[in-house]
Swiss-Prot record:
This is Outer-membrane lipoprotein carrier protein. It is found in: Periplasm. CDD domains: LolA. Keywords: Chaperone, Periplasm, Protein transport, Signal, Transport. Monomer. It comes from Xanthomonas axonopodis pv. citri (strain 306). InterPro entries: LolA/LolB/LppX, OM_lipoprot_carrier_LolA-like, OM_lipoprot_carrier_LolA_Pbac. The lineage of its organism: Bacteria, Pseudomonadati, Pseudomonadota, Gammaproteobacteria, Lysobacterales.
Length: 209
């Protein structure tokens, strides 16, 4: 997966609960009063034939409204920051940052609907898997309008500590599986967590104004 396009898939993460009820009930319970999350992730991307294309890991932070930070540590460093208006994608090895306005990728992702639960049933057909899988309770989200989303289906797996895994299948059958751990609910984020200021010498591509 192209490094600067990963945010479109990664934006489909989040928000869980610690109960043993069904996945939908867990989601509804946990989103009450939820303003942000901070934790670690590991990602595995496979093609339609199951061949591994990419593995990566790092740290993720999310907050309302429409703010997120994906900080990749392995296999190479990369930082993706959204401040609610713009998305910044910084590649340290290239000394380059690409910036663009936040648009339909975020507006039509489960992330927005999960932060604002009122949008969940409006944008997606929501269903629970009948039985646990891999020890998790699963909630499936299928976009009601195909052209409004970058994926065919997203599945959220809930365990004892909340959202443990997310699986996303795109239009060509590529599957992205993300495991989450160490969630901190409503943490006190540093002031610059969801802001990016290019350092001296970094090339800026796009509209930073």
């Amino acid at each position: 997966m192209h490094r600067q396009l990963r945010y479109a898939v990664l934006a489909t993460a989040l928000f869980a609960s610690t109960a043993f009820a069904g996945a939908r009930q867990e989601l509804d319970t946990f989103t009450r009063g939820l303003k942000g999350l901070d934790g670690q992730f590991s990602q595995r991307v496979t093609d339609a034939n199951g061949r591994v294309k990419e593995t990566s890991s790092g740290r993720v932070a999310l907050a309302t409204p429409r703010q997120f930070r994906w900080e990749y540590a392995k296999p190479y460093k990369q930082l993706i920051v959204a401040d609610g208006k713009k998305v910044w994608v910084f590649d340290p090895d290239l000394e380059q940052v690409t910036v663009r306005a936040q648009g339909s990728e975020e507006q039509n992702s489960p992330l927005v609907a999960l932060i604002d639960p009122a949008l969940l049933d409006k944008k997606y057909d929501v269903s629970e898997e009948a039985a646990p899988r891999d020890g998790l309770q699963w909630l499936s989200l299928t976009p009601k309008v195909d052209t409004d989303a970058s994926f065919q289906i997203a599945s959220l797996g809930f365990g004892r500590e909340g959202l443990a895994r997310m699986e996303v299948v795109d239009a060509v059958g590529q599957r992205t599986a993300i495991g989450f751990s160490g969630w901190k609910r409503n943490p006190a984020f540093a002031a610059d967590t969801f802001r990016y200021t290019p350092a001296k010498g970094v090339d800026v591509v796009g509209d930073a104004q």
